[in-house]
Amino acid sequence: LLAAARASGMLVVHTREGHRPDLSDLPDWKRIRAERSGAPIGAAGPLGRLLVRGEYGHDLIDELQPQVGEPVIDKPGYCAFAATDLELILRSRGIDTLIITGVTTEVCVSSTLRSAIDRGFNCLTVSDACASAHPELHAAALAMIGVEGGIFGEVCDSAALLSALREAA
């Protein structure tokens, strides 16, 4: 899917959630919730400190590394639009349609999708290019997109999208 998007000339934007090394941009409520879940933000782990910018575990996985010119949005929260320049990047290029993929479906993907819709973007979420640790929440988040005639855009799988990209080429 990534190779096809690049080959078709689409702008690929990468996002990743993380905080400053001193955690000065980490709200108390988020810190407390993360501690309750057993995964405190900033805690040391096998990939470095959890959700801390600059740590190995904060980086994109090797298979999804950006190419030259592909923006990387470092977001302090769940939504890729909040406290970032994502909207400016998209608007300055005349982009009005987003193909959304990522993790976690019910949190970051959903937050970004809803914010994009509120900002007037047309959105397509790729069901099998999104993931969650909880299959039931993944399914529920995808189901919510299509309610009321597609209130949050549309959903398709990667095979359908790849087919549409081939036809458009």
Model-predicted regions and their roles:
Residues L1-L11:
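A short, N-terminal amphipathic alpha-helix
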Residues A7-S8, H19, D25, K30-A169:
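Active-site-adjacent betaalpha module
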Residues T15:
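A cross-family glycoside hydrolase active-site/sugar-binding cleft signature
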